[in-house]
UniProtKB/Swiss-Prot annotation:
Disulfide bonds: C123-C360
Entry's EC annotation: 2.1.1.192
Cofactors demanded by this protein: [4Fe-4S] cluster
The species this protein was found in: Erwinia tasmaniensis (strain DSM 17950 / CFBP 7177 / CIP 109463 / NCPPB 4357 / Et1/99)
Main location, first listed in the record: cytoplasm
Localization in the cell: Cytoplasm
Gene3D superfamilies xref list: 1.10.150.530, Aldolase class I
GO molecular function: 4 iron, 4 sulfur cluster binding; metal ion binding; rRNA (adenine(2503)-C2-)-methyltransferase activity; rRNA binding; tRNA (adenine(37)-C2)-methyltransferase activity; tRNA binding
CDD domains in the record: Radical_SAM
Gene name linked to the record: rlmN
Highest taxon listed in the record's lineage: Bacteria
Protein name as catalogued: Dual-specificity RNA methyltransferase RlmN
Enzyme's top EC category: transferase
PROSITE patterns on file: RADICAL_SAM (PS51918)
Amino acid sequence: MSELNVTPSSVSPEIVIPKKEKINLLDLNRQQMREFFAGLGEKPFRADQVMKWIYHYCCDDFDEMTDINKVFRNRLKELAEIRAPEVAEEQRSSDGTIKWAIQVGGQQVETVYIPEKDRATLCVSSQVGCALECKFCSTAQQGFNRNLRVSEIIGQVWRAAKIIGATKVIGQRPITNVVMMGMGEPLLNLTNVVPAMEIMLDDFGFGLSKRRVTLSTSGVVPALDKLGDMIDVALAISLHAPNDTIRDEIVPINKKYNIETFLASVSRYIGKSNANQGRVTIEYVMLDHINDSTDNAHELAALLKETPCKINLIPWNPFPGAPYGRSSNSRIDRFSKVLMEYGFTTIVRKTRGDDIDAACGQLAGDVIDRTKRTLKKKMAGEAISVKAL
Protein backbone atom coordinates (compact mmCIF):
# COMPACT_ATOMS: atom_id res chain seq x y z
CA MET A 1 0.00 0.00 0.00
CA SER A 2 1.34 3.49 -0.84
CA GLU A 3 2.00 5.86 2.06
CA LEU A 4 1.78 9.61 2.67
CA ASN A 5 4.66 10.93 4.77
CA VAL A 6 3.90 13.94 6.99
CA THR A 7 6.89 15.59 8.71
CA PRO A 8 6.20 18.40 11.23
CA SER A 9 8.50 21.43 11.35
CA SER A 10 9.92 20.22 14.66
CA VAL A 11 12.40 17.38 15.01
CA SER A 12 9.76 14.93 16.27
CA PRO A 13 9.69 11.47 14.57
CA GLU A 14 8.08 11.15 11.14
CA ILE A 15 4.36 10.35 11.20
CA VAL A 16 3.26 7.85 8.54
CA ILE A 17 -0.40 8.12 7.51
CA PRO A 18 -1.58 5.29 5.23
CA LYS A 19 -3.05 6.51 1.98
CA LYS A 20 -6.12 4.58 0.84
CA GLU A 21 -5.65 2.74 -2.45
CA LYS A 22 -7.91 3.69 -5.30
CA ILE A 23 -10.43 1.18 -6.63
CA ASN A 24 -9.54 -0.03 -10.11
CA LEU A 25 -12.90 -0.01 -11.91
CA LEU A 26 -11.64 -2.72 -14.28
CA ASP A 27 -11.85 -5.11 -11.32
CA LEU A 28 -15.64 -4.66 -11.08
CA ASN A 29 -18.42 -6.31 -13.08
CA ARG A 30 -21.66 -4.37 -13.52
CA GLN A 31 -23.24 -5.49 -10.25
CA GLN A 32 -20.09 -4.65 -8.31
CA MET A 33 -19.81 -1.32 -10.13
CA ARG A 34 -23.39 -0.43 -9.17
CA GLU A 35 -22.71 -1.38 -5.54
CA PHE A 36 -19.61 0.82 -5.51
CA PHE A 37 -21.56 3.76 -6.95
CA ALA A 38 -24.44 3.18 -4.53
CA GLY A 39 -21.93 3.57 -1.73
CA LEU A 40 -21.16 7.00 -3.18
CA GLY A 41 -24.85 7.91 -3.17
CA GLU A 42 -25.28 7.46 -6.93
CA LYS A 43 -28.03 5.63 -8.81
CA PRO A 44 -27.35 2.51 -10.91
CA PHE A 45 -27.54 4.35 -14.23
CA ARG A 46 -24.43 6.33 -13.29
CA ALA A 47 -22.40 3.12 -13.03
CA ASP A 48 -23.78 2.03 -16.41
CA GLN A 49 -22.69 5.35 -17.92
CA VAL A 50 -19.16 4.92 -16.66
CA MET A 51 -18.99 1.31 -17.89
CA LYS A 52 -19.98 2.44 -21.39
CA TRP A 53 -17.21 5.02 -21.38
CA ILE A 54 -14.68 2.45 -20.21
CA TYR A 55 -15.57 -0.37 -22.60
CA HIS A 56 -17.32 1.24 -25.58
CA TYR A 57 -14.88 4.13 -25.90
CA CYS A 58 -11.84 2.57 -24.17
CA CYS A 59 -11.73 5.68 -22.00
CA ASP A 60 -9.47 5.73 -18.95
CA ASP A 61 -9.77 9.46 -18.15
CA PHE A 62 -12.73 10.58 -16.03
CA ASP A 63 -12.43 14.12 -17.43
CA GLU A 64 -13.40 12.80 -20.88
CA MET A 65 -16.72 11.44 -19.57
CA THR A 66 -18.62 14.55 -20.60
CA ASP A 67 -22.14 13.37 -19.68
CA ILE A 68 -21.10 13.09 -16.01
CA ASN A 69 -21.05 16.27 -13.94
CA LYS A 70 -17.66 17.71 -13.06
CA VAL A 71 -18.15 17.49 -9.29
CA PHE A 72 -18.71 13.73 -9.45
CA ARG A 73 -15.88 13.26 -11.95
CA ASN A 74 -13.53 14.93 -9.49
CA ARG A 75 -14.80 12.68 -6.71
CA LEU A 76 -14.18 9.62 -8.87
CA LYS A 77 -10.62 10.77 -9.53
CA GLU A 78 -10.01 10.79 -5.79
CA LEU A 79 -11.46 7.34 -5.13
CA ALA A 80 -11.06 5.30 -8.31
CA GLU A 81 -8.94 4.68 -11.38
CA ILE A 82 -9.17 2.87 -14.70
CA ARG A 83 -5.85 1.04 -15.01
CA ALA A 84 -5.25 -1.67 -17.58
CA PRO A 85 -1.89 -3.46 -17.77
CA GLU A 86 0.58 -1.89 -20.17
CA VAL A 87 2.09 -3.41 -23.30
CA ALA A 88 5.78 -4.16 -22.77
CA GLU A 89 6.41 -5.39 -26.31
CA GLU A 90 4.48 -5.82 -29.54
CA GLN A 91 5.30 -8.28 -32.33
CA ARG A 92 3.51 -8.47 -35.68
CA SER A 93 3.41 -11.61 -37.79
CA SER A 94 3.56 -11.71 -41.56
CA ASP A 95 0.00 -13.13 -41.50
CA GLY A 96 -1.40 -10.14 -39.57
CA THR A 97 -1.38 -11.76 -36.13
CA ILE A 98 -0.24 -9.46 -33.30
CA LYS A 99 1.31 -10.66 -30.04
CA TRP A 100 1.54 -8.36 -27.04
CA ALA A 101 3.71 -9.00 -24.01
CA ILE A 102 1.56 -7.54 -21.22
CA GLN A 103 3.23 -6.23 -18.08
CA VAL A 104 1.68 -7.57 -14.85
CA GLY A 105 3.74 -6.50 -11.88
CA GLY A 106 7.33 -7.49 -12.56
CA GLN A 107 6.32 -10.25 -14.99
CA GLN A 108 4.72 -10.63 -18.40
CA VAL A 109 1.89 -12.62 -19.91
CA GLU A 110 1.07 -12.83 -23.59
CA THR A 111 -2.07 -11.85 -25.50
CA VAL A 112 -2.63 -12.63 -29.18
CA TYR A 113 -4.85 -10.81 -31.69
CA ILE A 114 -5.85 -12.88 -34.73
CA PRO A 115 -7.64 -10.91 -37.47
CA GLU A 116 -9.60 -12.67 -40.21
CA LYS A 117 -11.98 -11.49 -42.93
CA ASP A 118 -15.15 -12.05 -40.94
CA ARG A 119 -13.88 -11.91 -37.36
CA ALA A 120 -11.15 -10.76 -35.02
CA THR A 121 -10.24 -13.14 -32.20
CA LEU A 122 -8.32 -12.28 -29.06
CA CYS A 123 -6.53 -15.05 -27.15
CA VAL A 124 -6.38 -14.05 -23.48
CA SER A 125 -4.23 -15.32 -20.58
CA SER A 126 -5.69 -16.16 -17.16
CA GLN A 127 -2.58 -16.89 -15.09
CA VAL A 128 1.08 -15.94 -14.89
CA GLY A 129 2.43 -19.28 -16.09
CA CYS A 130 0.62 -22.57 -15.58
CA ALA A 131 0.88 -25.39 -13.04
CA LEU A 132 -0.55 -28.21 -15.17
CA GLU A 133 2.73 -29.22 -16.84
CA CYS A 134 1.34 -30.32 -20.22
CA LYS A 135 4.41 -31.63 -21.97
CA PHE A 136 3.74 -30.16 -25.41
CA CYS A 137 3.03 -26.59 -24.21
CA SER A 138 5.62 -23.84 -23.88
CA THR A 139 3.69 -22.05 -21.12
CA ALA A 140 3.94 -25.13 -18.89
CA GLN A 141 7.72 -25.03 -19.07
CA GLN A 142 7.70 -21.57 -17.44
CA GLY A 143 6.20 -22.82 -14.19
CA PHE A 144 3.48 -20.98 -12.26
CA ASN A 145 3.53 -17.74 -10.30
CA ARG A 146 0.02 -16.44 -9.62
CA ASN A 147 -3.53 -15.89 -10.84
CA LEU A 148 -4.34 -12.77 -12.82
CA ARG A 149 -6.78 -10.28 -11.31
CA VAL A 150 -10.04 -9.37 -13.06
CA SER A 151 -8.47 -6.09 -14.20
CA GLU A 152 -5.48 -7.96 -15.64
CA ILE A 153 -7.74 -10.32 -17.61
CA ILE A 154 -10.36 -7.88 -18.91
CA GLY A 155 -7.52 -5.37 -19.16
CA GLN A 156 -5.98 -7.47 -21.95
CA VAL A 157 -9.21 -7.09 -23.94
CA TRP A 158 -9.41 -3.39 -23.08
CA ARG A 159 -5.80 -2.77 -24.08
CA ALA A 160 -6.20 -4.62 -27.39
CA ALA A 161 -9.40 -2.71 -28.18
CA LYS A 162 -7.65 0.56 -27.30
CA ILE A 163 -4.86 -0.25 -29.75
CA ILE A 164 -7.07 -1.57 -32.56
CA GLY A 165 -9.81 1.02 -32.07
CA ALA A 166 -12.76 1.25 -29.67
CA THR A 167 -16.24 0.29 -30.92
CA LYS A 168 -17.63 3.83 -30.67
CA VAL A 169 -14.51 5.26 -32.28
CA ILE A 170 -14.13 3.05 -35.36
CA GLY A 171 -17.82 2.16 -35.74
CA GLN A 172 -17.39 -1.61 -35.46
CA ARG A 173 -16.23 -4.16 -32.93
CA PRO A 174 -12.44 -4.33 -32.81
CA ILE A 175 -12.77 -7.79 -31.24
CA THR A 176 -15.58 -10.19 -32.17
CA ASN A 177 -14.40 -13.29 -30.31
CA VAL A 178 -12.47 -13.93 -27.11
CA VAL A 179 -10.87 -17.28 -26.34
CA MET A 180 -9.52 -18.06 -22.88
CA MET A 181 -6.71 -20.09 -24.41
CA GLY A 182 -3.66 -18.03 -23.47
CA MET A 183 -1.32 -18.69 -20.57
CA GLY A 184 -2.77 -20.60 -17.63
CA GLU A 185 -5.68 -22.91 -16.79
CA PRO A 186 -8.80 -20.69 -16.54
CA LEU A 187 -10.66 -23.08 -14.25
CA LEU A 188 -7.96 -22.70 -11.60
CA ASN A 189 -8.78 -18.98 -11.49
CA LEU A 190 -12.59 -18.96 -11.47
CA THR A 191 -12.72 -16.14 -8.92
CA ASN A 192 -11.28 -13.72 -11.46
CA VAL A 193 -12.04 -15.36 -14.81
CA VAL A 194 -15.83 -15.43 -14.34
CA PRO A 195 -16.25 -11.71 -13.53
CA ALA A 196 -13.95 -10.87 -16.45
CA MET A 197 -16.09 -12.96 -18.80
CA GLU A 198 -19.22 -11.31 -17.38
CA ILE A 199 -17.81 -7.96 -18.50
CA MET A 200 -17.05 -9.41 -21.94
CA LEU A 201 -20.71 -10.46 -22.26
CA ASP A 202 -22.30 -7.38 -20.67
CA ASP A 203 -23.98 -4.90 -23.04
CA PHE A 204 -22.33 -2.12 -21.02
CA GLY A 205 -19.04 -3.99 -21.30
CA PHE A 206 -17.81 -5.44 -24.60
CA GLY A 207 -21.24 -6.84 -25.47
CA LEU A 208 -20.06 -10.14 -26.96
CA SER A 209 -22.42 -13.05 -27.56
CA LYS A 210 -21.94 -15.96 -25.16
CA ARG A 211 -21.22 -18.10 -28.22
CA ARG A 212 -18.26 -15.84 -29.01
CA VAL A 213 -16.55 -16.19 -25.63
CA THR A 214 -14.83 -19.56 -25.31
CA LEU A 215 -13.17 -21.08 -22.26
CA SER A 216 -10.66 -23.87 -22.82
CA THR A 217 -9.80 -26.33 -20.06
CA SER A 218 -7.52 -29.31 -19.61
CA GLY A 219 -9.98 -30.94 -17.23
CA VAL A 220 -10.23 -29.53 -13.71
CA VAL A 221 -13.49 -31.40 -13.13
CA PRO A 222 -14.75 -29.85 -9.85
CA ALA A 223 -14.22 -26.37 -11.27
CA LEU A 224 -15.94 -27.28 -14.55
CA ASP A 225 -18.99 -28.43 -12.59
CA LYS A 226 -18.89 -25.15 -10.69
CA LEU A 227 -18.51 -23.10 -13.88
CA GLY A 228 -21.82 -24.37 -15.24
CA ASP A 229 -23.61 -22.82 -12.26
CA MET A 230 -21.83 -19.47 -12.62
CA ILE A 231 -21.85 -18.49 -16.30
CA ASP A 232 -22.76 -19.77 -19.75
CA VAL A 233 -20.00 -19.55 -22.36
CA ALA A 234 -18.74 -21.77 -25.15
CA LEU A 235 -16.51 -24.63 -24.00
CA ALA A 236 -13.42 -26.13 -25.60
CA ILE A 237 -11.74 -29.12 -24.02
CA SER A 238 -8.03 -29.83 -24.37
CA LEU A 239 -8.22 -33.57 -24.88
CA HIS A 240 -5.17 -34.35 -27.05
CA ALA A 241 -5.31 -38.12 -26.60
CA PRO A 242 -7.66 -41.02 -27.38
CA ASN A 243 -6.89 -42.95 -24.19
CA ASP A 244 -5.67 -42.51 -20.63
CA THR A 245 -2.26 -44.06 -21.29
CA ILE A 246 -1.25 -41.34 -23.75
CA ARG A 247 -3.05 -38.55 -21.90
CA ASP A 248 -1.43 -39.45 -18.56
CA GLU A 249 1.92 -38.82 -20.22
CA ILE A 250 1.23 -35.56 -22.08
CA VAL A 251 -1.52 -34.01 -19.89
CA PRO A 252 -0.61 -34.98 -16.29
CA ILE A 253 -3.86 -33.72 -14.74
CA ASN A 254 -5.41 -36.80 -16.37
CA LYS A 255 -3.91 -38.84 -13.53
CA LYS A 256 -6.23 -36.94 -11.20
CA TYR A 257 -9.30 -36.68 -13.45
CA ASN A 258 -9.21 -39.29 -16.20
CA ILE A 259 -10.90 -39.03 -19.58
CA GLU A 260 -14.10 -40.77 -18.49
CA THR A 261 -14.48 -38.42 -15.51
CA PHE A 262 -13.65 -35.39 -17.67
CA LEU A 263 -16.15 -36.24 -20.41
CA ALA A 264 -18.87 -36.91 -17.83
CA SER A 265 -18.30 -33.41 -16.48
CA VAL A 266 -18.38 -31.99 -20.01
CA SER A 267 -21.74 -33.69 -20.56
CA ARG A 268 -23.09 -32.07 -17.39
CA TYR A 269 -21.89 -28.67 -18.58
CA ILE A 270 -23.54 -29.11 -21.99
CA GLY A 271 -26.78 -29.89 -20.18
CA LYS A 272 -26.66 -26.50 -18.46
CA SER A 273 -25.39 -24.46 -21.42
CA ASN A 274 -27.07 -22.68 -24.31
CA ALA A 275 -23.86 -21.13 -25.60
CA ASN A 276 -22.56 -24.45 -26.93
CA GLN A 277 -25.66 -25.21 -29.01
CA GLY A 278 -25.53 -28.75 -27.70
CA ARG A 279 -21.91 -29.51 -28.51
CA VAL A 280 -18.38 -28.64 -27.46
CA THR A 281 -15.10 -28.19 -29.27
CA ILE A 282 -12.50 -30.92 -28.86
CA GLU A 283 -8.92 -29.67 -29.14
CA TYR A 284 -6.43 -32.29 -30.26
CA VAL A 285 -2.78 -31.37 -30.81
CA MET A 286 -1.11 -33.56 -33.43
CA LEU A 287 2.17 -35.02 -32.15
CA ASP A 288 4.20 -37.08 -34.58
CA HIS A 289 3.92 -40.81 -33.82
CA ILE A 290 2.54 -40.07 -30.34
CA ASN A 291 -1.21 -39.65 -30.87
CA ASP A 292 -1.65 -39.32 -34.63
CA SER A 293 -1.99 -42.85 -36.08
CA THR A 294 -5.13 -44.04 -37.86
CA ASP A 295 -5.64 -46.46 -34.96
CA ASN A 296 -5.61 -43.45 -32.65
CA ALA A 297 -8.22 -41.80 -34.87
CA HIS A 298 -10.53 -44.84 -34.70
CA GLU A 299 -10.03 -44.94 -30.93
CA LEU A 300 -10.85 -41.23 -30.62
CA ALA A 301 -14.02 -41.66 -32.65
CA ALA A 302 -15.15 -44.48 -30.38
CA LEU A 303 -14.31 -42.41 -27.30
CA LEU A 304 -16.37 -39.43 -28.45
CA LYS A 305 -19.38 -41.25 -29.89
CA GLU A 306 -21.58 -40.09 -26.99
CA THR A 307 -20.16 -36.55 -26.84
CA PRO A 308 -21.74 -34.04 -29.24
CA CYS A 309 -18.73 -32.17 -30.56
CA LYS A 310 -16.68 -30.77 -33.37
CA ILE A 311 -12.99 -31.64 -33.46
CA ASN A 312 -10.14 -29.20 -34.02
CA LEU A 313 -6.91 -30.90 -35.05
CA ILE A 314 -4.01 -28.63 -34.13
CA PRO A 315 -0.64 -29.10 -35.84
CA TRP A 316 1.83 -28.94 -32.96
CA ASN A 317 3.88 -25.75 -32.78
CA PRO A 318 7.48 -26.35 -31.68
CA PHE A 319 9.40 -24.55 -28.95
CA PRO A 320 13.03 -24.95 -27.78
CA GLY A 321 13.80 -28.16 -25.91
CA ALA A 322 10.49 -29.87 -26.64
CA PRO A 323 10.74 -33.66 -27.11
CA TYR A 324 8.09 -33.84 -29.84
CA GLY A 325 7.72 -33.34 -33.55
CA ARG A 326 4.83 -31.97 -35.58
CA SER A 327 2.74 -34.57 -37.38
CA SER A 328 3.23 -34.55 -41.13
CA ASN A 329 0.46 -33.17 -43.31
CA SER A 330 -0.20 -36.66 -44.66
CA ARG A 331 -0.67 -38.13 -41.17
CA ILE A 332 -2.96 -35.26 -40.19
CA ASP A 333 -4.95 -35.73 -43.39
CA ARG A 334 -5.40 -39.48 -42.80
CA PHE A 335 -6.39 -38.85 -39.18
CA SER A 336 -8.94 -36.24 -40.24
CA LYS A 337 -10.47 -38.48 -42.90
CA VAL A 338 -11.04 -41.29 -40.40
CA LEU A 339 -12.92 -38.93 -38.08
CA MET A 340 -15.02 -37.54 -40.91
CA GLU A 341 -15.94 -41.06 -41.97
CA TYR A 342 -17.50 -41.44 -38.52
CA GLY A 343 -19.50 -38.27 -39.12
CA PHE A 344 -17.51 -35.85 -36.94
CA THR A 345 -17.14 -32.26 -38.06
CA THR A 346 -13.35 -32.07 -38.21
CA ILE A 347 -11.26 -28.98 -38.83
CA VAL A 348 -7.49 -28.74 -39.16
CA ARG A 349 -6.62 -25.48 -37.46
CA LYS A 350 -4.64 -23.08 -39.59
CA THR A 351 -1.44 -22.10 -37.81
CA ARG A 352 -1.29 -18.35 -37.17
CA GLY A 353 1.56 -16.29 -35.79
CA ASP A 354 4.13 -19.07 -35.51
CA ASP A 355 6.85 -16.78 -36.90
CA ILE A 356 6.53 -14.68 -33.71
CA ASP A 357 5.90 -17.62 -31.35
CA ALA A 358 2.24 -16.62 -31.03
CA ALA A 359 0.71 -19.89 -32.21
CA CYS A 360 -1.14 -22.40 -30.04
CA GLY A 361 1.17 -23.82 -27.35
CA GLN A 362 3.96 -21.29 -27.94
CA LEU A 363 3.04 -18.57 -25.44
CA ALA A 364 5.65 -18.19 -22.73
CA GLY A 365 5.81 -14.66 -21.32
CA ASP A 366 8.20 -13.83 -18.49
CA VAL A 367 7.34 -15.86 -15.39
CA ILE A 368 9.02 -16.13 -12.01
CA ASP A 369 8.20 -19.72 -11.08
CA ARG A 370 6.84 -19.60 -7.53
CA THR A 371 5.92 -23.26 -7.18
CA LYS A 372 8.15 -26.18 -7.95
CA ARG A 373 5.62 -28.42 -6.21
CA THR A 374 2.77 -27.89 -8.76
CA LEU A 375 1.13 -31.10 -9.85
CA LYS A 376 3.67 -33.56 -8.43
CA LYS A 377 2.72 -33.06 -4.80
CA LYS A 378 -0.92 -32.59 -5.71
CA MET A 379 -0.92 -36.03 -7.30
CA ALA A 380 0.47 -37.39 -4.05
CA GLY A 381 -2.78 -36.57 -2.33
CA GLU A 382 -3.45 -32.86 -2.23
CA ALA A 383 -6.69 -31.71 -3.87
CA ILE A 384 -6.39 -29.28 -6.74
CA SER A 385 -8.12 -26.14 -5.53
CA VAL A 386 -10.95 -24.65 -7.57
CA LYS A 387 -10.45 -21.38 -5.74
CA ALA A 388 -7.90 -18.72 -6.61
CA LEU A 389 -4.45 -20.12 -5.88
